[in-house]
Regions:
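Alpha-helical transmembrane segments and their helix-start/interface "positive-inside/aromatic belt" motifs
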Residues: 31-35, 178-191
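Hydrophobic, small-residue-rich membrane helices and short re-entrant helix-turn-helix hairpins
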Residues: 27, 102-114, 173-183, 254-267
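Small-residue-rich segments of transmembrane alpha-helices in multi-pass membrane proteins
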Residues: 39-46, 111-116, 184-198
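Membrane-interface "cap" regions at the ends of multi-pass membrane proteins
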Residues: 1-58, 169-172, 194
Length: 267
């Protein structure tokens, strides 16, 4: 049953790429989706680019364990500072200016905005160099999660995901990416709800889960003497918590894969 679902998912992803190929006839269509991507697809594309492997591996595993219930502040910060404000402040401005300058990428935007070929080249090098470890971390997290869930070899997961992604992106361009992000975003939302429900059910409900969490020792944290630190308002390590909120919320304002979503919106 699990194998059948997995195969169906892979076929669906590739099928979306083939379907979108018919609507991709120019470079503008391939890179920007013809600047015609609607609000729902754009929102899910932004969200799945923002919260990829980190939502299940980083937030749930690392931050959840380090900060307890206070890690909820990270989600709130990401939603307001990392998602809402960029759209309000950068969204329209970036869309209008990138259209006016006829730029399809961030390096191209900088080059034409400041009439500087050097800035275009330098920004392209920066994007290329620093997106390599970023992309590697995403594939690493997803492959480990996938491997544990389906008992598949890690190396096979990495190669398989890279090949599948390459196929639908190369074949269908950005429209295929946006449509796949929409589908995968729905799957992620369902998965998050299912994980939370299963966790609370296994602990006897929300109140009992919080009660059990309050008895976990904070030894090894910044406040080892704080009783019930994992259920406190700011957690056992508020300074590092604030740092994580700022880093994960404001850092997205300049990520090329996030800003690129503004280039593609229809209106």
């Amino acid at each position: 049953m699990i194998l059948a679902i997995l195969i169906l998912y892979i076929l669906s992803v590739v099928g979306i790429g083939i379907y979108c190929r018919k609507k991709t006839s120019t470079v503008n269509d391939f890179v920007l989706g013809g600047r015609s991507v609607g609000p729902w697809f754009t929102a899910f594309a932004y969200g799945t680019s923002y919260f990829s492997a980190v939502i299940f591996v980083g937030y749930a595993g690392k931050f959840g364990w380090n900060f307890g219930l206070a890690s909820t502040w990270i989600g709130i910060g990401n939603a307001i500072l990392g998602s809402l404000l960029p759209w309000l402040i950068l969204g329209r401005r970036t869309r209008v200016m990138s259209k006016h300058l006829e730029s399809a990428t961030m390096p191209e935007f900088f080059g034409r905005r400041f009439n500087s070929k050097a800035m275009k080249i330098i920004s392209a090098i920066i994007v290329f160099v620093f997106l390599i470890p970023y992309t590697a971390s995403v594939y690493n997290g997803l492959s480990r999660l996938f491997g544990m869930a389906f008992n598949i070899d890690y190396s096979f997961c990495v190669v398989g995901m890279a090949v599948i992604t390459a196929v639908y992106v190369i074949v269908g361009g950005y429209k295929a990416t946006a449509l796949n992000d929409f589908v995968q975003g729905i799957i992620m939302l369902v998965g998050i709800v299912a994980v939370i429900a299963a966790t609370l059910a296994s602990k006897g409900g929300f109140s009992e889960a919080v009660n059990q969490l309050s008895h976990i020792s904070t030894e090894g944290t910044a406040s080892p003497e704080l009783n019930g630190g994992f259920v406190s308002f700011f957690g056992p390590d508020p300074i590092n918590l604030l740092g994580v909120i700022i880093l994960t919320s404001l850092g997205t304002w300049g990520l090329p894969q996030m800003v690129h979503k503004f280039y593609t919106i229809k209106d």
